Amino acid sequence: MIIDIGNSRAKVVVMDGDTLVKEYAAEEFSASLFAEIMEAYPAISRAIIASTRGDEEVVKSIVAQRIDRVIIFKPAT
């Protein structure tokens, strides 16, 4: 799972190796969006979070409830 939090919207991509499986887009990344994705793809075990907003720790707190392996890219990265 790749989560890209931009200035105007959040995009989430589900990958299987090098293959893009599904794309999601919303104004905000939320616990309900994450739950929807995890319900559809319960085998997801890794996530990358990138944010230009500086809210990556909030997103991580949602994601870390179900996924242990999380990499974060912050605005300064």
Mark where each language-model region is:
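Basic/polar, acidic-poor N-terminal "presequence/leader" segments
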Residues: 14-36
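Gly/Thr-rich phosphate-binding beta-strand-loop-beta motif of the actin/hexokinase/Hsp70
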Residues: 1-21
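Phosphate/pyrophosphate-binding loops at sites that engage ATP/ADP/AMP, CoA/4′-phosphopantetheine
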Residues: 35-46, 66
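N-terminal beta-alpha supersecondary unit
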Residues: 22, 27, 47-57
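Phosphate- and divalent-cation-binding pockets in alpha/beta enzyme and binding domains
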Residues: 11, 57-59
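Short glycine-rich phosphate-binding loop at a beta-alpha junction
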Residues: 43-53, 69-73
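Glycine/small-residue-rich loop that forms an oxyanion/phosphate-binding "nest" at active or ligand-binding sites
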Residues: 61-77
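Short, surface-exposed, polar/charged, turn-prone segments marking secondary-structure boundaries
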Residues: 29-32, 40-42, 75-77
